[in-house]
């Protein structure tokens, strides 16, 4: 079938949540003509759940997005009300930044960025159909019967895809925050042959700030020391009058209220059918699963400077409204709190992610990409990371350039995408530091070193960011070289100085770099013996030097593992491989290979249920085929 289009674009992005804005901005900045279509422009980059960006693993993802040339880091640095570095008492691999956002300002600021972006058309429009010819995407059709042509389409519909909100025994069609649900498009994706799943997530009630008794809660202030998500942000712009959060707890009375009303809880009455998030369960689920716990933490998080709404983090629920009120009033500090918004659960359709390539393009339809909660993830950061990769690859496909695949050793974004396309997910997927086997090289402090050259190569990193990066990289390289050459000798004067500082004296000569490997020796101490750098070093360069030097042995071991895995990743598997033709392979492995259709030996080796023997047989089979082809040639 041939279509007549009302307008033509290179890339169309469907949905303007956190995935959609990153996808559309990336493609537009790479020179493509882009349409960003969304049901409601007021919901662009909206935060329907928690008013925060970052956190464990997620904060590193935001840094990675920024390093590649994405927008989330810059946007939150302009709109936060509190900033805090997490896990400071632990090793550098798990440290991550978290910001409380002014959620209205965050969305408004991002909307201004999108509106001003060259090559990007923003349109309030509901897309009902992905138009496909000969298994290739050619455009979209809207609810108003407008047809827009495109060489690539990125679907980032979030929880709107056949969304249904649930509160007690009330269930109605809706996207997040009572926006319209996208039902016709959900039907269309299924008709196109994509396998669809059904997930559930939820949000807690909001209470009025002036009705909270803060004296009964524990204050949670932000950090005084400047920290930023974007590598472009400056310390002098760090917010001084930050707004605190507050900590309180559930108690036995709270738990009794929930237990006495479980028969009215949609999760337990059978109303909720979708699979919920393991790492962000509802309060009723927590009370049942962790019956031995006599209390659970609740954080009271302001939703912005110009609003009275406070998000009760940890109290996600779909209990009936009257039960939610009773529950809130059982909590210390909230005895007289006024509930402004009711908590709710939302069920929605997802595209099962094993159907995707590592570029986030569907295997079934050329030019059709999906990203964000559409792929079964949870969280704004996970969505934004996928949106960025999908937008980059949509642009590269249109431009006829090589695709971008972030490996597990490149970024947490790469870990997430590999997990999704290789293992799939049976529940809303959340990034955790424990998912990354190379986490010591995927740190908060080195995201730019890892990814800014990649962003530059694909055309997303502009001259300003590139020059800032080069200055930092050159400073780091020069000072690391100097510290590797400058020596401390075990002479009397040096050892007396070391002992005066309370440290063990030298027995052998060593470089300043070797001296810094001692746990107690930081950069400032080392330079007392070898002198300062020839230039004033940025504090972030010093932080990077200390981490790279102190953990060098562990980092090198990780890099050795990366090199071994790289060899596996370079061994490609033909798209048209006949899995039934491989003798002796285990039945479970054959079934998994058929379902996922891995692209490399490395990916095949990470599929659950596939053992080393299966991989050995597969490699022998591929080598035999290669030899046969070489003889024919």
From Swiss-Prot:
<keyword id="KW-0274">FAD</keyword>
<dbReference type="InterPro" id="IPR044920">
    <property type="entry name" value="MnmG_C_subdom_sf"/>
</dbReference>
<dbReference type="GO" id="GO:0050660">
    <property type="term" value="F:flavin adenine dinucleotide binding"/>
</dbReference>
<comment type="subunit">
    <text>Homodimer. Heterotetramer of two MnmE and two MnmG subunits.</text>
</comment>
<dbReference type="InterPro" id="IPR002218">
    <property type="entry name" value="MnmG-rel"/>
</dbReference>
<dbReference type="Pfam" id="PF13932">
    <property type="entry name" value="SAM_GIDA_C"/>
</dbReference>
<feature type="binding site">
    <location>
        <begin position="15"/>
        <end position="20"/>
    </location>
    <ligand>
        <name>FAD</name>
    </ligand>
</feature>
<dbReference type="Pfam" id="PF21680">
    <property type="entry name" value="GIDA_C_1st"/>
</dbReference>
<feature type="binding site">
    <location>
        <position position="373"/>
    </location>
    <ligand>
        <name>FAD</name>
    </ligand>
</feature>
<dbReference type="GO" id="GO:0030488">
    <property type="term" value="P:tRNA methylation"/>
</dbReference>
<keyword id="KW-0819">tRNA processing</keyword>
<dbReference type="InterPro" id="IPR026904">
    <property type="entry name" value="MnmG_C"/>
</dbReference>
<keyword id="KW-0963">Cytoplasm</keyword>
<comment type="similarity">
    <text>Belongs to the MnmG family.</text>
</comment>
<keyword id="KW-0520">NAD</keyword>
<keyword id="KW-0285">Flavoprotein</keyword>
<feature type="binding site">
    <location>
        <position position="182"/>
    </location>
    <ligand>
        <name>FAD</name>
    </ligand>
</feature>
<dbReference type="InterPro" id="IPR047001">
    <property type="entry name" value="MnmG_C_subdom"/>
</dbReference>
<dbReference type="Pfam" id="PF01134">
    <property type="entry name" value="GIDA"/>
</dbReference>
<feature type="binding site">
    <location>
        <position position="127"/>
    </location>
    <ligand>
        <name>FAD</name>
    </ligand>
</feature>
<dbReference type="InterPro" id="IPR020595">
    <property type="entry name" value="MnmG-rel_CS"/>
</dbReference>
<comment type="function">
    <text>NAD-binding protein involved in the addition of a carboxymethylaminomethyl (cmnm) group at the wobble position (U34) of certain tRNAs, forming tRNA-cmnm(5)s(2)U34.</text>
</comment>
<dbReference type="InterPro" id="IPR036188">
    <property type="entry name" value="FAD/NAD-bd_sf"/>
</dbReference>
<feature type="binding site">
    <location>
        <begin position="276"/>
        <end position="290"/>
    </location>
    <ligand>
        <name>NAD(+)</name>
    </ligand>
</feature>
<dbReference type="InterPro" id="IPR004416">
    <property type="entry name" value="MnmG"/>
</dbReference>
<dbReference type="InterPro" id="IPR049312">
    <property type="entry name" value="GIDA_C_N"/>
</dbReference>
<protein>
    <recommendedName>
        <fullName>tRNA uridine 5-carboxymethylaminomethyl modification enzyme MnmG</fullName>
    </recommendedName>
</protein>
<dbReference type="InterPro" id="IPR040131">
    <property type="entry name" value="MnmG_N"/>
</dbReference>
<dbReference type="GO" id="GO:0005829">
    <property type="term" value="C:cytosol"/>
</dbReference>
<dbReference type="GO" id="GO:0002098">
    <property type="term" value="P:tRNA wobble uridine modification"/>
</dbReference>
């Amino acid at each position: 079938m041939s279509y007549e289009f009302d307008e033509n674009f290179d890339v169309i992005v469907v949905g303007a949540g956190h995935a959609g804005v990153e996808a559309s901005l990336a493609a537009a900045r790479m020179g493509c003509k882009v349409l960003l279509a969304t049901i409601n422009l007021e919901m662009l980059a909206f935060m329907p759940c928690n008013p925060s960006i970052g956190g464990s693993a997620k904060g590193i993802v935001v840094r990675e997005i920024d390093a590649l040339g994405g927008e989330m880091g810059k946007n939150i640095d302009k709109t936060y009300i509190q900033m805090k570095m997490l896990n400071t008492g632990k090793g550098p691999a798990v440290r991550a930044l978290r910001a409380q956002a002014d959620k209205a300002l965050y969305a408004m600021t991002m909307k201004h960025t999108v509106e001003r972006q060259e090559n990007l058309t923003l349109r309030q429009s509901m897309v009902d159909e992905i138009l496909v010819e000969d298994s290739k995407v050619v455009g979209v059709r809207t609810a108003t019967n407008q047809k827009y042509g495109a060489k690539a389409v990125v679907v980032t519909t979030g929880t709107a895809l056949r969304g249904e909100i649930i509160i007690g025994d009330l269930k109605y069609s809706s996207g997040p925050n009572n926006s319209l649900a996208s039902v016709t498009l959900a039907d269309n994706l299924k008709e196109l042959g994509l396998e669809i799943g059904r997930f559930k997530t939820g949000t807690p009630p909001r209470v009025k700030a002036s009705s909270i008794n803060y004296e009964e809660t524990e204050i949670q202030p932000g950090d005084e020391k400047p920290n930023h998500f974007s590598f472009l942000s400056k310390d002098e712009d760090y917010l001084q009058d930050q707004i605190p959060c507050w900590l309180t707890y559930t108690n036995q009375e709270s738990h009794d209220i929930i237990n006495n009303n479980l028969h009215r809880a949609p999760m337990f009455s059978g109303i909720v059918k979708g699979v919920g998030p393991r790492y962000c369960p509802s309060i009723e689920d927590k009370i049942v699963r962790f019956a031995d716990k006599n209390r659970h933490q609740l954080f009271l998080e302001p939703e912005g400077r110009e609003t009275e709404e406070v998000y009760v983090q940890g109290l996600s629920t779909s209990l009936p409204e009257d039960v939610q009120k009773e529950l809130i009033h059982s909590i210390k500090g909230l005895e007289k709190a006024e509930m402004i918004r009711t908590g709710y659960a939302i069920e929605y359709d997802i595209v099962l992610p094993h159907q995707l390539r590592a570029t986030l393009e569907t295997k079934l339809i050329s030019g059709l990409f999906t990203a964000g909660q559409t792929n079964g993830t949870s969280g704004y950061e996970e969505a934004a990371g996928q949106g960025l990769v999908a937008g980059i690859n949509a642009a590269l496909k249109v431009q006829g350039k090589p695709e971008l695949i972030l490996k597990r050793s490149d970024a947490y974004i790469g870990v997430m995408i590999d997990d999704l396309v290789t293992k799939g997910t049976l529940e809303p997927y959340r990034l955790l530091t424990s998912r990354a086997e190379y986490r010591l090289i995927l740190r908060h402090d080195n995201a730019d070193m890892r990814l800014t050259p990649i962003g530059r190569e694909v055309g997303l990193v502009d001259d300003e960011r590139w020059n800032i990066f080069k200055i930092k990289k050159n400073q780091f390289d020069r000072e690391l070289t100097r510290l590797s050459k400058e020596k401390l000798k075990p002479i009397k004067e040096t050892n007396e100085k070391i002992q005066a500082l309370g440290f063990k004296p030298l027995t052998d000569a060593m470089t300043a770099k070797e001296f810094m490997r001692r746990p107690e020796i930081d950069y400032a101490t080392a330079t007392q013996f070898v002198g300062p750098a020839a230039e004033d070093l940025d504090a972030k360069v010093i932080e990077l030097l200390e981490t790279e030097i102190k953990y060098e042995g562990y980092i090198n071991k990780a890099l050795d593992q990366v090199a071994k895995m790289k060899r596996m990743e370079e061994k490609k598997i033909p798209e048209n491989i006949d899995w039934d033709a491989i003798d002796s392979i285990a039945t479970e492995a054959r079934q998994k290979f058929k379902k996922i259709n891995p692209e490399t030996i490395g990916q095949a080796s990470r599929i659950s249920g596939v053992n080393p023997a299966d991989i050995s047989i597969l490699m022998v089979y591929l080598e035999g085929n290669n030899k046969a082809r070489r003889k024919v040639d």
